[in-house]
């Protein structure tokens, strides 16, 4: 998903900067994202919104959005985009949680959502969690949701 988004934005430049970053050490305690937020390459005050797409699997049953209750305006925008384009089955709100790389950004006052997909295979971080068993059924719709949400968020 991240590579497809990067490819899309490289081919479709925006009037604002979009950064893509991958972190290591999540399972060891969000080490990479914690380090980055303590030693940012750009001022965190310049980050308008962070989207974390960790756990972007099948999505047959929709997505859950961590920090939805922290940013109700943006969550409402996301739902409006989904309703307009009829992309995902549902979008569930969730509150603040220290469960992925968005967390330390949120703690530094950077607005952030963490999307994780629902449904599909049950393997998660075990020997059965392999690329060939992950069908990515809603990958395209999640991709479109992010593109449309970014446009709405940035006022396009």
List each language-model region with its residue ranges:
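Short, surface-exposed linear patches
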Residues: 1, 41-45, 71-75, 134-138, ...
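Alpha-helical metal-binding/catalytic segments enriched in His/Glu/Asp
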Residues: 1-30, 146
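Generic alpha-helical secondary structure signal
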Residues: 5, 12-13, 40, 75, ...
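Sec/Tat-exported extracytoplasmic proteins
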Residues: 6-13, 22, 40, 82-86, ...
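Metal-dependent peptidase/peptidase-like ectodomains
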Residues: 24-123
């Amino acid at each position: 998903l991240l590579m497809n988004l990067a490819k899309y934005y490289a081919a479709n430049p925006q009037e604002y900067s979009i950064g893509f970053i991958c972190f290591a050490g999540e399972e060891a305690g969000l080490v990479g994202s914690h380090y980055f937020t303590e030693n940012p390459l750009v001022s965190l005050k310049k980050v308008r919104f962070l989207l974390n797409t960790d756990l972007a699997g099948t999505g047959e049953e929709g997505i859950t959005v961590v920090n939805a209750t922290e940013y109700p305006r943006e969550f409402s925008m996301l739902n409006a985009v989904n309703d307009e384009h009829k992309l995902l089955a549902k979008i569930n709100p969730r509150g603040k949680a220290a469960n992925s790389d968005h967390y330390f950004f949120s703690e530094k006052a950077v607005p952030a959502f963490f999307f994780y997909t629902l449904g599909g295979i049950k393997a998660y971080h075990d020997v059965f969690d392999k690329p060939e068993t992950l069908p990515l059924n809603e990958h395209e719709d999640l991709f479109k949701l992010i593109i449309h949400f970014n446009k709405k968020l940035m006022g396009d």
